[in-house]
Every structure is written in structure tokens, then in C-alpha cells.
């Protein structure tokens, strides 16, 4: 585009009428720059996005890989060269396995090159031309597959630094679930099936095996998602977190969008009058009569929140660096991918409401065991959820927690629920307050009894004195 100094001039300058072609020249002056958001970015085929700076500013390290670059967005960055140097070695191991099945290298390369147009449409911005991008897809795709195959036990490789250094493997697990660090899932399928090392239905299984430890779920939890057709690895693992919500659970309210902004008491919605309001914090809900219950199930998604009467049932959240990074990138994916639902975003907003301050985290962590904190201080957990909830947009009428929000608000609106809950909290919260209240009640009853006895005694004395014979004259 035109330079800023070309646009700003003194008010005394007298500009002559521009030639007819000047406006078109101005528009085309920046056409040689790479397109940062393609027109195809709004289509279902586009699923890998560059996270905007407004998101990055809130969590600067959350969207950038620590040890390995996958795909074009972070290729060549200096701090990622350590694993980059190992990729050709793992690629060769993969090609050796394919060769045992009579599949040559050029067959796999050609299969990926034939997908070039589809691959380019999967990214939100314009990528460099030439075959280098396709070669990158082959290298990164084979690296990922080899990591999965080794970790699942399909291929043995002993004393390899990538798999024997715990910190390194943990970092790779996080890096493979970053939105900017993805290759299309169909590239992985093409290489996996084309190599004849495995069948397409096994790809999800070995991917789940790789991520099962940091997510800490049983085998049956993963099995139900074995046939899911993912867009990329982030989408695949995100799918396993989604609750099984029937259409009847979803609200039939008008279509409304909620945007959260920071207020004095936390994040508050900016919506029209038809919108479902958000809920109070955990401690305040407790004072309004809402009871919190831990929902225990290894096969249950942590998003399976339920409200039964005044009991809010929440699965345990094991919150650590891996899950926090995963949440952030899932929210970014749901915000940018046009064909995505909004379950993770809704859950984050829900938890952001509950965890408004450090005391709320302490209550759900220590008293109810709903949060298992491996992330940092209780205040850091609260700040995380409040920060990630800022400026996200989600559709209330398709929110899977819509009925929970409505049910909680309807219960807390009834003044007598809060009055009784407050009385119970004040006098019967713990054995000590209960004993203290009983002691006070005993003293009150004893005092009333003493007063009653004194009054009755006085009345009896007065009655007795009234019926007595008068004393003789002259005697006192």
C-alpha cells in the first residue's frame, strides 16, 4: 500500500486531480504481499488458522510450539531446530517400514503432491509456491506417524532420545495440539494407508494411544471416537472431549450471540434482553443454595456438567500445562473454523463464571475435589479462566450448557432458597458451627424455661397471698 508519508501532507498542499488509473494503482500497490486471510478461509475446507495477535497478547506462549514445528507456519524457527534435525531419521525409518510392504518413496511423495490444491485450501493464509510445501507435508506427516507407531508399540525403537527423555516427549504432545502447528488429517491418512503399514481405521487408535497419558482416560473413553473423521490432530482430540448431548437437551431460545467483556466482578455478558444470563461464582452460588457434587467417571468427558434440582454435578478437572494449552487452542479453533461447534468455549465460559477469584478455586479444589490443580496457584487458575473468557463469542441457543445456565439462574432467583441456604451456611456449615448453634439454642431454651418458671412461680405466690387470712389487728 502507499507509504504513510505519501498520504499525510500539510493542509496547504493543493493536490491536482488524479489520473483515471491512480485509484486502481493504489489498490494494487500491496497485491504482491502474501494474502494473510484467503477468501477460502470461510469455507468448510479451511481448518488451520494463524492465531491473531489479540489472542496471542493474552497468552503469549500458548500458541507457539516449544520443540517441534509441524506444517508451514513455524517452519525454520531457530529454537525448533533440535527436533527438525531428527525428522529425516524418523522419515527414513518410516520409509524402511513401507519398503517392507513393497511401497517406494516416490509413491508416497506423489500421493501427497496430488493433494496439493486440497492441502493449500486447508490453510487460512497464502503459502509459498512450489513443491517445498508438499515435501514438508511428507516429512512432517511421516514424523508424526512414526512417533505414533513407536509409542503404540507397533514399531520397536529402543533408547531413542525423543522417546526416552520425558520432558521432550511431553513437549511434543503439547506441540502436536497447537492450532498453528497442524497438517491436514487426510495427509496423515494418505501416508499411513499408502505405506500399507496400517489401515485407515487404526490411525485414530494410535493417535489416541499417544495422547492418553496426559488426558488420563480409560480405553473405552477413546473407543467410541475411533471412526471420527477429523480435520487435524487438534480436532481429533477435541472431539473426544465433547459430551454426548441429545437434541432434546438443547434450548429452543432465539438465536443470540454472547460476547464477554471484563467488568468489576469478572466477565459479564453484553447481550440483548432475550439472552440467557451467565451465572454467579461458586462461592456465591453456594450461598444461594446451589450444591456442588463431584461427578466421578473415568469414561466421562470433563464437559459432562449436569444440574439436578439444586445439585450441580461437575466431573473432575485435572488442570495442568497440557490441558491449559489444549483449551486455548480449542477455543481458537472453535472461534475461527466456520463448521465447528462451541462446546469447549462454552465450558470455558462456564468455569470462568464459577472461578471468579482465588476463593472459588479453593472451594472447588479443597472442599469438593472438583479441581485437581497442577497448573499453579489458585489465583493463577482463576486468572486463566477469566482471561481466556475475554472477547469470545458463542451462540447461546446451541450451547450445550444452556439448560444448566437457565436452571441455576431460575433457582437462585427465588429469594427463599438463598435465605434458607444462608441460614444453613451460617449455623450448620461445620460440626463446630453446628455445636455452637446448638449451644446457643440450648442457652436460649434454658433462659426461656427459667423465665417461664419464674413467671409461674410469681403468679402462684400472688394467688396464694390473695387467699390468705388477714393478720390480727394491732399486729404487723
Curated annotation (Swiss-Prot):
Residues 1-24 are annotated as: Disordered. The keyword Transmembrane helix applies. It is a multi-pass membrane protein. It comes from the Eukaryota. Its main location: membrane. GO terms for cellular component: plasma membrane. Keywords: Membrane, Transmembrane, Transmembrane helix. It is found in: Membrane. The chain crosses the membrane at residues 133-153, 439-459. Belongs to the UPF0481 family. This is UPF0481 protein At3g47200.
Amino acid at each position: 500500500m502507499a507509504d504513510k508519508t505519501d498520504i499525510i501532507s500539510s493542509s496547504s498542499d493543493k493536490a491536482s486531480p488524479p489520473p483515471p488509473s491512480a485509484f486502481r494503482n493504489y489498490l494494487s500497490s500491496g497485491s504482491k504481499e502474501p494474502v494473510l486471510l484467503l477468501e477460502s478461509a470461510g469455507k468448510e475446507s479451511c481448518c488451520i488458522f494463524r492465531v491473531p495477535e489479540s489472542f496471542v497478547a493474552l497468552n503469549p506462549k500458548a500458541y507457539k510450539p516449544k520443540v517441534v514445528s509441524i506444517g508451514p507456519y513455524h517452519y525454520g524457527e531457530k529454537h525448533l531446530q533440535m527436533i527438525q534435525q531428527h525428522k529425516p531419521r524418523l522419515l527414513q525409518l518410516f520409509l524402511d517400514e513401507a519398503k517392507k510392504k513393497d511401497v517406494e518413496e516416490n509413491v508416497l511423495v506423489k500421493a501427497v503432491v496430488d493433494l496439493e490444491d486440497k492441502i493449500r485450501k486447508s490453510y487460512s493464509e497464502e503459502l509459498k509456491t512450489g513443491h517445498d510445501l508438499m515435501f514438508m507435508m511428507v516429512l512432517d506427516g511421516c514424523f508424526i506417524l512414526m512417533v505414533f507407531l513407536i509409542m503404540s508399540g507397533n514399531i520397536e525403537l529402543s533408547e531413542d532420545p525423543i522417546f526416552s527423555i520425558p520432558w521432550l516427549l511431553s513437549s511434543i504432545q503439547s506441540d502436536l495440539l497447537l492450532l498453528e502447528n497442524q497438517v491436514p488429517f487426510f495427509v496423515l491418512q494418505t501416508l499411513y494407508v499408502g505405506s500399507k503399514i496400517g489401515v485407515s481405521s487404526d490411525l485414530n487408535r494410535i493417535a489416541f494411544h499417544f495422547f492418553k497419558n496426559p488426558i488420563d482416560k480409560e480405553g473405552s473413553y477413546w473407543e467410541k471416537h475411533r471412526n471420527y473423521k477429523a480435520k487435524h490432530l487438534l480436532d481429533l482430540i477435541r472431539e473426544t472431549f465433547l459430551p454426548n448431548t441429545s437434541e432434546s437437551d438443547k434450548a429452543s431460545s432465539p438465536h443470540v450471540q454472547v460476547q464477554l467483556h471484563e467488568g468489576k466482578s469478572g466477565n459479564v455478558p453484553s447481550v440483548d434482553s432475550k439472552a440467557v444470563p451467565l451465572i454467579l461464582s461458586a462461592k456465591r452460588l453456594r450461598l444461594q443454595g446451589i450444591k456442588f457434587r463431584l461427578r466421578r467417571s473415568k469414561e466421562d468427558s470433563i464437559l459432562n456438567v449436569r444440574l439436578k434440582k439444586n445439585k450441580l454435578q461437575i466431573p473432575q478437572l485435572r488442570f495442568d500445562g497440557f490441558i491449559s494449552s489444549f483449551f486455548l487452542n480449542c477455543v481458537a479453533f472453535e472461534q475461527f473454523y466456520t463448521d465447528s461447534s462451541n462446546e469447549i468455549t462454552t465450558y470455558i465460559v462456564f468455569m470462568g463464571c464459577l472461578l471468579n477469584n482465588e476463593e472459588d478455586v479453593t472451594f472447588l479444589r479443597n472442599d469438593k475435589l472438583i479441581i485437581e490443580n497442577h497448573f499453579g496457584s489458585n489465583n493463577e487458575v482463576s486468572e486463566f479462566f477469566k482471561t481466556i473468557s475475554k472477547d469470545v463469542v458463542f451462540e447461546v441457543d446451541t450451547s450445550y450448557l444452556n439448560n444448566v445456565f437457565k436452571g441455576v439462574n431460575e433457582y437462585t432467583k427465588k429469594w427463599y432458597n438463598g435465605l434458607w441456604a444462608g441460614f444453613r451456611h451460617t449455623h450448620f456449615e461445620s460440626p463446630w458451627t453446628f455445636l455452637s448453634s446448638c449451644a446457643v439454642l440450648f442457652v436460649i431454651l434454658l433462659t426461656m424455661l427459667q423465665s417461664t418458671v419464674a413467671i409461674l412461680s410469681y403468679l402462684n405466690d400472688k394467688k396464694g397471698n390473695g387467699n390468705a387470712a388477714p393478720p390480727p389487728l394491732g399486729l404487723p
